[in-house]
Amino acid sequence: MIFRQLFDNRSSTYTYLISSGEGREALIIDPVIENVNKYVNLLKELNLKLVKVIDTHIHADHVTGASKLKDITKCSRIMGDHTPADTVEIRVKDDEYINLDNIKLRAMYTPGHTSDSYSFLMDNYLFSGDTLLINGTGRTDFQNGNAVDSYLSLIHISEPTRLEPI
């Protein structure tokens, strides 16, 4: 498996590149528009084809790079079905799976940071977007955020899980 955690200093956003390495297909979670060329170069360096890009929620603190990545790579843009975004090809529901070669990511509706926040569980890795941060949680004071919803949306995870970002 190929796994890269990338960090944008300006927006403090974590982006993830994931591939099984077998079929050379990849997906990216929470891309930042200013780093799209960096992602494209990394994909070339690793000999990967981007087929899916996921936004965990609509971001208020930065512009997503998903549409630009779609324009460059022809990948599919994915978000949870609670999103009001109209530029999404695939909308996933809570407990639905996204497949990439032999990798499965389970979509989990995790409102709280925003009303359209989703997290994605891959084996024991939870990609929580901005719901959980290093040493804290995401803000809940905009985009219909709610601190109680944020807590309740993640407390039910019972299996041992590595939370991203870490």
What kind of feature is each model-predicted range?
Residues 25, 86-88, 135-143:
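A short acidic, helix-capping loop that chelates divalent metal ions and anchors anionic groups
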